[in-house]
Amino acid sequence: ASRGRVGGGALEESLPALHSLRVLSWDRGDCVAVPPQAVRAVLAAARRRGGTVVVDLPRRLDEGVGEVLAQLDLALLVVPAELRAVAAAGRIAAAVGMAVRDLRVAVRGPYAPGLDDREVARLLGLPLAGEVPVEPGLLRPRGGGRPPGASGRGPLARFCTGFWERALVESGGAR
């Protein structure tokens, strides 16, 4: 296996940009595993550029995902408010919780009967980061290449703004 260092500038320039957000996506297939060394090099390059690095992880846990988890300051598990989803999230939370010191849950509506955001957090034994309400704009095709929440209005934008403000206060400043 080869080893090397990824340059932060080269990484940034190679990624697509959308409204000043650089995106490197995880493969959603079941057969591609990213070696931990590659994950480590890419995360190190992203961190060297400064600012916050947001990682959207797949549902499966492998060595590459484990490398990401080991480097996280905070993990947010987004869980639909449905019984089957909560049960599946419980298994994921148990595994992720062993690698991440600050794991929180964000609950996505609509809610199944008898469930609300606090009940989901209680069932998972995780601190509640907040509720992610249904975002009507995500249910229809988007034109113009604007990402969800780009207008700064709407349920997703409000959740992200509130979560980010709380995270900055808790961490002691800007990231």
Which residues make up each language-model segment?
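P-loop/Walker-type NTP enzyme "switch/lid" segment
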Residues: 1-51, 138-144, 148-150
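Intrinsic-disorder/low-complexity, polar/charged segments
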Residues: 7-9, 68, 82, 154
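Conserved catalytic-core segment of NTP-binding enzymes
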Residues: 38-141
